[in-house]
Amino acid sequence: MIGNQPNVNNLDVNLEELVLPVSLLADEELSPDGDPEEEEHYPYTIDTCCKPCGAGVRFTIIATPSAVITLRQLLLQEVFLTCLRCSRSLFRHGRS
């Protein structure tokens, strides 16, 4: 400020020093704070039934708890398993 009484005309502001260079923002990248924490993998046994005949189907997986939740949702809604007998009769061991 210049003068005894402050007013807008007395402001001595150099705005060029406050403006960031364009390349600083355009080329800016955020560095990761660290590796994301990896979830532990655990063994799970899944009991379900064969869609065509209703026989019991059991299998074991090693997965994270969140993956097991996703698999559970798939098995309850969209994905159906078959037993070995139905698989052989439906797909004839991969032969057409």
Curated annotation (Swiss-Prot):
Keywords tagged on the record: Activator, DNA-binding, Early protein, G1/S host cell cycle checkpoint dysregulation by virus, Host cytoplasm, Host nucleus, Host-virus interaction, Inhibition of host innate immune response by virus, Inhibition of host interferon signaling pathway by virus, Interferon antiviral system evasion, Metal-binding, Modulation of host cell cycle by virus, Oncogene, Transcription, Transcription regulation, Viral immunoevasion, Zinc, Zinc-finger
Keyword Transcription recorded: yes
A Pfam family this chain is assigned to: E7
Domain of life assignment: Viruses
Subcellular locations according to the entry: Host cytoplasm; Host nucleus
unnamed zinc finger segments: 50-86
Cited InterPro entries: Papilloma_E7
PTM statement from Swiss-Prot or TrEMBL: Highly phosphorylated.
Entries under Gene3D superfamilies matching the protein: 3.30.160.330
GO biological process, one term: symbiont-mediated suppression of host innate immune response
GO cellular component: host cell cytoplasm; host cell nucleus
Record bears the keyword Disulfide bond: no
Alphabetical list of SUPFAM superfamilies matching this protein: E7 C-terminal domain-like (SSF161234)
GO MF annotation: an example: protein domain specific binding
Ranges for region E7 terminal domain: 1-42
Motif Nuclear export signal, chain ranges: 68-76
Similarity comment text for this entry: Belongs to the papillomaviridae E7 protein family.
Known role: Plays a role in viral genome replication by driving entry of quiescent cells into the cell cycle. Stimulation of progression from G1 to S phase allows the virus to efficiently use the cellular DNA replicating machinery to achieve viral genome replication. E7 protein has both transforming and trans-activating activities. Induces the disassembly of the E2F1 transcription factor from RB1, with subsequent transcriptional activation of E2F1-regulated S-phase genes. Interferes with host histone deacetylation mediated by HDAC1 and HDAC2, leading to transcription activation.
Description of how the protein assembles with itself and partners: Homodimer. Homooligomer. Interacts with host RB1; this interaction induces dissociation of RB1-E2F1 complex thereby disrupting RB1 activity. Interacts with host EP300; this interaction represses EP300 transcriptional activity. Interacts with protein E2; this interaction inhibits E7 oncogenic activity. Interacts with host TMEM173/STING; this interaction impairs the ability of TMEM173/STING to sense cytosolic DNA and promote the production of type I interferon (IFN-alpha and IFN-beta).
Domain notes for this protein: The E7 terminal domain is an intrinsically disordered domain, whose flexibility and conformational transitions confer target adaptability to the oncoprotein. It allows adaptation to a variety of protein targets and exposes the PEST degradation sequence that regulates its turnover in the cell.
Name of this chain's protein: Protein E7
Organism of derivation: Human papillomavirus type 60
Gene name of this polypeptide: E7
